[in-house]
Regions:
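Alpha-helical lid/collar subdomain of P-loop NTPases
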Residues: 140-257
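AAA+ P-loop NTPase catalytic core and its hallmark functional loops
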Residues: 1-161, 165, 255-257
């Protein structure tokens, strides 16, 4: 989502500003500004980059991970995003001036909406209604493989296909009647794996960093992690085969037989 949004911003060829709302711990400081006290000058107000952004004519402002933002950030954005209001009150400033959003300013936001996403909040419907919603489905195998080759041209087509196939298998598995895993490999993780492959790591090594930590190892040979090792094993070369411990090897042999 973020990558697509950034490509959109680049294509528009207009002044652009990026704000990761999911990462900020200080919504007021990020969107309005902060007051500072100096003995010589007294209390001063430093407006935020966001204030500059909304005053920039024809700017495109990307609000990334808005579904992870603090509710206070949503409250601040309500009037800014409302087509009938389009203003921001700097209530941290001693004079509390009102800043109007400049002509032609466009806001683009990204969000993960749904119970399967952790660390997100149920978004206020009034905030959601201020946007035109574009739903993005998961890439299919061919699309994901093509994306990996585009972003990391140093990997082989076979490597790109293998990573895309592993990701696709996890997405199908969690939708099955009796899924053996509780989450799937995202496109973001696929891209990270491809980056490691391009840097010279093999698939087994990349999986240790990018895949297995996201899958529970409780349950021994019946664990999610063992299942994922079995999936990855199918796409590892002979030099990468030793990815199981002794118990997992026995389980793998039983599965193969």
């Amino acid at each position: 989502k973020t990558m697509a949004a950034k490509k959109l911003v680049e294509a528009l060829d207009r002044p652009d500003f990026y704000f990761n709302l999911g990462a900020t711990q200080d919504p007021r400081g990020t969107l309005i500004g902060n007051t500072h006290f100096k003995k010589e000058e007294g209390t001063t107000f430093a407006e935020s980059l966001f204030v500059k952004a909304i005053q920039t004519k024809d700017a495109v402002i990307l609000l990334d991970e808005i579904s992870r933002a603090h509710p206070e950030a949503w409250n601040i954005l309500m009037t800014v995003l409302d087509a009938g209001q389009r203003y921001l009150r700097l209530d941290e400033h001693v004079d509390a001036p009102t800043i109007k959003v400049a002509e032609g300013v466009t806001f683009v936001a990204t969000a993960n909406i749904g119970n399967e996403y952790t660390a997100t909040r149920a978004m206020d419907r009034a905030l959601v209604d201020r946007f035109i919603i574009v739903e993005m489905d998961t890439l299919n195998k061919d699309q994901e493989s093509g994306l990996l080759k585009d972003l990391h041209p140093g990997i082989t087509q076979e490597q790109a296909d293998n990573v895309a196939e592993i990701a696709s298998m996890t997405r199908k598995e969690i939708k099955s009647d009796a899924p053996r895993i509780t989450n799937a490999i995202s496109t973001r993780i696929s891209v990270e794996i491809a980056g490691l492959l391009e840097d010279g790591f093999n698939l087994a090594e990349a999986a240790e960093v990018c895949i297995y930590p996201f899958f529970d190892e409780d349950g021994g040979v019946d664990s999610e992690r063992t299942y994922m090792k079995q999936v990855v094993q199918k796409y590892c070369g002979t030099a990468e085969e030793d990815i199981f411990n002794a118990d997992e090897v026995e389980a793998q042999e039983e599965l193969d037989s």
